[in-house]
């Protein structure tokens, strides 16, 4: 297994990091997801208030948390129809373990992408398949990852591109997962969620 895992080319990123640091507004380093900004007081207060909770949290989250996530998805992402919510430690954890949990045989992931999509497929002993953006060119698979806005390119998928991925998923009876962890990082184009374009049918869409 170890010999199949990719080596991440940190050295290859060095010249691009130098270019980014020359930007007038500074660089936003998304290479490791390490927080650099002060923790908001709201979060600090919530952590202090919950520090005397001597039990492990319920995996599914409290009803209050589930309702808050659901309302956020409706109001912020434009989600509609019936859908469930599940809190995770972070999107990277889900990316790494979902192919194993779903027992996926073939996993599609963006050809230019954060390495965890490939690593997750390899850990599950699935067949990883790197693809371009056009879903019409994708082969059949049982799990597909979309990443918008993209890390590392920053590219935002259009409505037609996202709808094409949904059509592909329906045709292949596949699970389609859109990693939108950077959805609030729009610049010249405002990112929109895949959930906005399901027309209320969220089956096999994450």
Place the predicted regions along the sequence by residue.
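N-terminal small-domain helix-loop-helix segment of the aminotransferase-like
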Residues: 2-90, 97
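Walker B catalytic acidic pair
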Residues: 180
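Residue-level marker for buried hydrophobic side chains located in beta-strands
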Residues: 176-177
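Conserved core of the PLP fold type I
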Residues: 53-168, 183-206
């Amino acid at each position: 297994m170890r010999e199949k895992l990719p080596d991440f080319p940190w050295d290859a990123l060095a010249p691009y990091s130098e270019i980014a640091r020359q930007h007038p507004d500074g660089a936003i380093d998304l290479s490791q997801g390490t927080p650099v900004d002060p923790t908001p007081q709201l979060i600090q207060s919530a952590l202090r208030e919950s520090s005397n909770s001597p039990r492990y949290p319920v995996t599914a989250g409290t009803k209050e948390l589930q309702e808050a996530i659901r309302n956020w998805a409706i109001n912020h992402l434009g989600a509609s129809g019936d859908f469930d919510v599940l809190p995770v430690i972070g999107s990277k954890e889900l990316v790494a373990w979902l192919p194993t949990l779903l027992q996926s045989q073939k996993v599609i992931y963006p050809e230019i992408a954060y390495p965890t999509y490939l690593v997750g497929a390899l850990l599950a002993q699935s067949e990883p398949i790197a693809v371009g953006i056009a879903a019409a060119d994708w082969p059949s698979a049982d799990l597909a990852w979309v990443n918008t806005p993209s890390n590392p390119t920053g590219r935002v998928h259009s409505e037609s591109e996202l709808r094409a991925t949904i059509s592909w998923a329906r045709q292949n009876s596949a699970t389609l997962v859109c990693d939108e962890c950077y959805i609030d990082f729009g610049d010249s184009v405002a990112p929109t969620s895949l959930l906005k374009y399901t027309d209320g049918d969220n089956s096999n869409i994450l």
